[in-house]
A protein has these predicted regions:
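Zinc-dependent metallohydrolase catalytic domains
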Residues: 1-113
């Protein structure tokens, strides 16, 4: 099955905007101080990991098929990788580079603001 981009576009844009606003708010909360490394992970890595974990779910195939034809929200796994691969900070946080599975060249990344 394929995701209907016409159906999900508005919510996909909202997901990207929300992720960017949350990331900016996280950095504002640091007040210029570096986030501590915890468990070997930087603050930015923990931020993106928490974002991804917030979308964890388990769906039955029938439910997923129904969602893809009637719900304006993309399935949860796409609500993670879709926005994150459009945020430059995600690349820096995890060292994502050309040739990596989810790499998207800068000129193809969506910019909301």
């Amino acid at each position: 099955m394929r995701i209907n981009g016409q159906l999900t576009m508005g919510e996909n844009i909202a997901d990207l905007a929300g992720l960017q606003v949350a990331y900016d708010a996280y950095h504002a909360s640091l007040k210029g101080k570096p986030a501590p490394v915890v468990g070997g992970m930087t603050g930015d890595q923990r931020f993106f990991l928490a974002f991804a974990q917030s979308w964890q779910d388990k769906s039955r195939d029938d439910s997923l098929k129904q969602q893809m034809v009637s719900d304006p929200h993309s399935p949860s796994n796409f609500r993670v990788i879709g926005p994150t691969r459009n945020v430059d900070a995600w690349y820096a946080a995890f060292g994502v580079k050309p040739g990596d599975k989810f790499y998207l060249p800068p000129e193809k990344r969506s910019r909301i603001w």
